[in-house]
Each structure stands twice: as C-alpha cells, then as structure tokens.
Amino acid sequence: MNTPKLLPSLMCVDFSRMAQTLEVFEQCGIDALHVDIMDGEFVPNYALGTDFCRQLRKLTPIPLDIHLMISRPDTKLSCFAIKPGEYVSVHWESTPHIHRTIGAIAALGGKPMLAINPATPYDVIRYLLPDLAGVLVMTVDPGFAGQQLVPAMLQKLRDLRAFLDENGYPDLEIEVDGNVSFENAEKMRQAGATMFVGGSSSVFWKGASLSENIQRMYAVIGKRNIAVLQAVK
C-alpha cells in the first residue's frame, strides 16, 4: 500500500508570497509540488512553463509533479530538464505516440504517469502498465481551476483500483486532480486514490492558514506522523 501524498497545485499559489509558501510546504513535509503546464492548444488556457520549473527548483528541494497538458509532449520533453525521481504526467489524448513518450520520460529519470480525461476509459492503460509509475485521473475537465467534481469519477476511481489490483499492480499510484476538496478527498481516498492535488478548495482555501489547511488535508487522506505547526498567516 502506497503512503498517501499531498501535492499542492501551484496554479493556485499567490506568486507574491511564493517564498513564504514554499517555506511552509517544506516545514509541513509536502511530498511534491504539482506544476500544471498548459499550451493553449490541448487545453483552452495557458499556465506556467519550462522556465518556471527551472526557477522553482532553485527555490526549494521539494520535487516536482509535472502535469503536461500540452499537445505532442513527445516533442517537448527536453524543454523541462526533468530531474530523477520527478513525476511527469502526459495525457493519453495528447499524442499518438504515448508509449514512446512514457519511455522517454523514464529514460530521463522521471516517473511516468498517464493522465486520463473524465471521458477516457480507464482501461486504455492496460498495455502500458509495466512502464508506468501511476495514473493521473482528471476528476474535472482539464484547463481551469475551481471546477466542480464530475460525479462519475468516484466510480471510475473504484473501477481503476480494482483493475490495477486484478492485473497485479496494487502499488501503482492513483493521482487525482480536480476539485480535491476536504470533502471530496476523503471519498477519493476511499475509492482508491493515493496522490492528491490540492488547490483552491483545500490547500489554498481562504478560510484558514496554509499550514492549517495542509494539516487538515493530511488528516483527511490518512497521512501519518504530522508535525503540529504554528499557523502562518
């Protein structure tokens, strides 16, 4: 059984407080930082980019969880200077050469993750299983923060978890991205999720401090050995 992981979505961060935010993340033992890369083509929005990843690595030792919402990622992987052990998610729908792309990520030292949109069946991963570190299940349509959970995705998570177990991959990670709120995260955990992308409805919720939100999410997803920290206002 994988240890639950919390991945703050930097699409939701207040960039004017980046240094303070990263300090809190380090103090709280955040597992990885979720970086959404959007090209305005695969999704109708632009976000972050290659230089952002490079600069971020200079500011914190926390590893990155790079989510490539871009067309033809197989032609652009070299732009991201992927570091050993970093998670890199590519969409099933983004390239006709998905197996080659996953292999290229692994060759660079990354941990390949296959991302699937809400309407994409989970079993498209069948022949890729030996090469994957995990599956990223989009629980909203990709492209924008603040959307509501697609209700059918909870059943999709249950079906995917059963599929992985039945095929001999019980330790493959299941990452969830989209409206991973305090309430939804518990349902997602019960459905089989192990990695949780926290955005405006959890980690960056305005109703409490950043550290308080993180501690609350840790409790929800079952992450143990939590340090009790003074709230950072």
Stretches found by the model and what they are:
Residues 18, 25, 36, 80, ...:
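Conserved, mostly hydrophobic/aromatic
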Residues 88-96, 136-148, 191-213:
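Glycine-rich phosphate-binding active-site loops on the catalytic face of alpha/beta enzymes
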Residues 21-22, 72-82, 119-132, 178-196:
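Catalytic cores of alpha/beta
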Residues 4-10, 33-35, 56, 64-68, ...:
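Hydrophobic faces of well-ordered beta-strands that scaffold small-molecule active sites
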Residues 28, 59, 83, 108, ...:
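Structural motif
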Residues 189, 203-233:
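C-terminal helical cap(s) of enzyme catalytic domains, especially alpha/beta-barrels
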Residues 35, 39-104:
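N-terminal active-site wall of soluble small-molecule enzyme domains
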Residues 39-47, 51, 118, 128-162, ...:
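Glycine/Thr-rich beta-alpha phosphate-binding loop at enzyme active sites
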